[in-house]
Amino acid sequence: MAAYQISYDLRKQKDYSSLIERIKSYGTWCHPLESTWIIVTEQTATQVRDYLKAVMDNDDGLLVTGLRGDGAWYGLSDNISQWLKNNL
C-alpha cells in the first residue's frame, strides 16, 4: 500500500462533490488542508490520477504525489496529526 498526496485546483464551476466522492471511495483518506487530501491505496499515482481526472474539467489542475514515510506538518488537528503518524 502506498500513500499519495492529492492537490487540485478546480478553475471553472468549483463543484468539488464528484471529485471528493471519488477521493473518499479509496476508504483510507485524510483531508488536512482545503485542496489537499492524502489517501492510501494499492494503485499507482497514474491510476489515481486517471480515476480522479475523469470527473474534472480540462482546465482544472491535479497533482498526485507519492509519499514515502517522512513528513512534517504544522497547525493541523490532533485527529489529522494522528492519521498522518499512522499512515505515512
Over which residues does each language-model region extend?
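Extended, hydrophobic alpha-helical segments
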Residues: 1-30, 36-43
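A sequence-composition feature that detects small, non-aromatic residues
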Residues: 2-3, 45, 54, 72
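Loop/helix-junction capping segments adjacent to catalytic residues or to phosphate/diphosphate-binding pockets
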Residues: 13, 46, 74
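Positively charged, polar, low-complexity stretches
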Residues: 17, 42-56, 84-88
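Surface-exposed beta-strand edges and their flanking turn/coil or helix-capping segments
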Residues: 19-21, 37, 52-54, 77-79, ...
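A common structural junction motif
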Residues: 25-31, 55-62
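A generic structural motif
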Residues: 32-37, 63-67
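C-terminal structural segments of small proteins and small subunits
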Residues: 56-88
